[in-house]
Amino acid sequence: MSLTEEKPIRPIANFPPSIWGDQFLIYEKQVEQGVEQIVNDLKKEVRQLLKEALDIPMKHANLLKLIDEIQRLGIPYHFEREIDHALQCIYETYGDNWNGDRSSLWFRLMRKQGYYVTCDVFNNYKDKNGAFKQSLANDVEGLLELYEATSMRVPGEIILEDALGFTRSRLSIMTKDAFSTNPALFTEIQRALKQPLWKRLPRIEAAQYIPFYQQQDSHNKTLLKLAKLEFNLLQSLHKEELSHVCKWWKAFDIKKNAPCLRDRIVECYFWGLGSGYEPQYSRARVFFTKAVAVITLIDDTYDAYGTYEELKIFTEAVERWSITCLDTLPEYMKPIYKLFMDTYTEMEEFLAKEGRTDLFNCGKEFVKEFVRNLMVEAKWANEGHIPTTEEHDPVVIITGGANLLTTTCYLGMSDIFTKESVEWAVSAPPLFRYSGILGRRLNDLMTHKAEQERKHSSSSLESYMKEYNVNEEYAQTLIYKEVEDVWKDINREYLTTKNIPRPLLMAVIYLCQFLEVQYAGKDNFTRMGDEYKHLIKSLLVYPMSI
């Protein structure tokens, strides 16, 4: 039966075109003589600083500050062994009973490292009446450190909930009087209130923290120089990778083969940077970028072009996972399906050479699950059905894509993704579920209005409005509260998941951080704001001045 006998009505989204053109297509590598030796010498100096601070207990608070600076400057991957050793020594020495300065920093760094230290240390911040001490209210840096520590809280930590309210209120007051605060610190406070450190992407943080750090009289010249050199070296690698994927994308020719779908290869690579910016994850970034570009085409086909009958055929083709399915598809779907098959076949062959077919099969099942649930959404849209949250969530948490994207990232990390890790991933761990909830809720908050202008499945907002009999504004309030709460669940699972390599857990955290950036105020992936555009340029266009 021909599907073209009658011109179908399509839910066209009118996506804006790419703003980048061929800007990143060509990359000319620039070799700076002697930089590698300079970097190696600087790294030796930093290692010595870490050793000296660790060897003297009186300097352990300074050690924490040094580690924090290394991480925020974007160079911790050079000192992973030293940082791991230092924080392990700190934990073995003090346990939960830290008695030095910078308690908030100690708490944040230990939890970030995976040590589930208690929050009892913050009882020292309160007076005999249970209120936070006035001396803390007058300590701007102390307030900021405590505020940042609260983002590591888990459900039930009341003292950190109180601390969040206290610090947020005091810091907000300070932003209303710019003249009473150091200008650089004033900017730091504004950034923190907008997005605490734990919810910021490390690479973006490096781009923004390096200039701030340079303005501090106390900055370490060795650290600063190393951070700037490394930023530029990594940026060169990233631009080379981006050039590669842009050429791959141009060969697909989206304007010819999928003109109504989103042309977002640069944004896909930016997402890849969010999943891991370090040099050792180059392969992971390239494959992740290609996969996200293909997944975006598939998602748009379901959301913004395909008819219900066409989508049933495409779903069956994905289930069969065979290039022989091309002949069964409508003409416009064939280039998309072929690109999909070619992209995943490339990775399958690579992993097969490493003896990791198990890892590829894990990723493949997540793709199939994603498409099956897109089909459920298409069915709801076709029927005009608004499901309850109980019916809605199991489907839309999957179609939000967080789980799929996490496992896609893992395909490029086969060296640390053990067989036990595969079993963990396919078991639908709570960490995946909570990151999926976060992604879905943030997406729905920012895409709801645009999606409801065409035939589209209902969002979380509509399910909340229907189930709780509330208006849209109140439903948004409920979802923002859920987003805040689900971060606490994510933190708990991050801290309590055992026997899984920490980089795999951090890949989930990086994804959550990226979602916070991507959906900051709008759906920047689809309709980019000026601030988001500047973030991309800060990582991929503008080098650090040395």
From Swiss-Prot:
Biotechnology: Artemisinin and derivatives (e.g. artesunate), are antimalarial drugs due to their endoperoxidase properties; they also display multiple pharmacological actions against inflammation,viral infections, and cell and tumor proliferation. Artesunate may be a promising treatment for COVID-19 mediated by the severe acute respiratory syndrome coronavirus 2 (2019-nCoV) (SARS-CoV-2) because of its anti-inflammatory activity, NF-kappaB (nuclear factor kappa B)-coronavirus effect and chloroquine-like endocytosis inhibition mechanism.
Pfam family, one: Terpene_synth
Top EC class for this record: lyase
Catalytic activity: (2E,6E)-farnesyl diphosphate = (+)-amorpha-4,11-diene + diphosphate
InterPro entries per UniProt: Isoprenoid_synthase_dom_sf (IPR008949), Terpene_cyclase-like_1_C (IPR034741), Terpene_cyclase_plant_C1 (IPR044814), Terpene_synth_N (IPR001906), Terpene_synth_N_sf (IPR036965), Terpene_synthase-like (IPR050148), Terpene_synthase_metal-bd (IPR005630), Terpenoid_cyclase/PrenylTrfase (IPR008930)
GO CC term (a single one): cytoplasm
Cofactor note as given: Binds 3 Mg(2+) or Mn(2+) ions per subunit.
Annotated family: Belongs to the terpene synthase family.
Protein's job: Involved in the biosynthesis of the antimalarial endoperoxide artemisinin. Catalyzes the formation of both olefinic and oxygenated sesquiterpenes, with amorpha-4,11-diene being the major product.
Full protein name: Amorpha-4,11-diene synthase
Annotated organism of origin: Artemisia annua
Gene name tied to this protein: AMS1
